[in-house]
Amino acid sequence: RTQMVGLLLPSDFIGRPGRKFAPFTVSAVTDVRLCCFRSRPFANLIEATPHIAQRLLEMTLDELDAAREWMLLLGRKTAREKIASFLAIIARRYAALAEGAEIGGMGVHLPTPQKLSFDLPLTRESMSDYLGLTIETVSRQISALKRDGVITLEGNRHVSVPNLDRLLAEAGDDSEDVFHDSAAE
C-alpha cells in the first residue's frame, strides 16, 4: 500500500539543504525537469544572497501551511470535500505559478480569476492513494462534481473550474478564502 504525504508541483523544492538523507522517498508521477544543487555551493549561495535565503524560508513556511491544510483535509472532510479540496489546491498552485511567469507545457489556462482550467498531475489511482480513498470513491466523487456543474472534464485529466468560489464552497473552506489570499501575494 502506498501512502503519499505530499505533492510537489513546478517550482517546488525537494529535500532540505544540509541533510545527507531525506526521511522519505520522492517519486515522479509525471515527467519532470529537475535542477540539482551540490550542498556546499548551495549553502554558500544562500549565505551570499539573502533574498534567496528569504525565499527558501518562505517556501518552507508554505510547505508547513500545506501540511496543516493536508491534516485538516484528511481528518475532517467528507470524500466529496476531499476531492474538491484537492482540485482547489491544484488550481491555487497553478494559478499562483501562472501569475508569476508564463507556464509552458503545463496545460494551465486562466481566462478570469473565477474561471480556470488545468491538467491534473495525478491519475485516479494516485489520487486515491493521496487522499486515502478508494479509486471507486474518487471516480464517483469526480463524476458527481462534474454532474453538479462544479467542474467540467476533457478526457481523464483536463479539469475546468467555471466558478472557483463554488469549488471552494464544495471543499468546505468557509473559514477563509485561501485561494484569493494565496494568489494575491
How should these model regions be labeled?
Residues M4-E69:
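Cyclic-nucleotide recognition modules
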Residues E47, H51, W70-L74, T78, ...:
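A short glycine-/small-residue-rich loop at the edge of a beta-strand within enzyme catalytic domains
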Residues I52, A67-W70, L74, L97, ...:
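Short, polar/charged, Gly/Pro-enriched helix-capping and turn/loop motifs at alpha-helix termini
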Residues L61, D65, A84-R92:
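Amphipathic, well-packed alpha-helical segments that form the structural scaffold of globular domains
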Residues G75, A79-K82, F86, T123:
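N-terminal positioning helix adjacent to the helix-turn-helix/winged-helix DNA-binding module
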Residues R92-E185:
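Phosphate-/nucleic-acid-contacting segments
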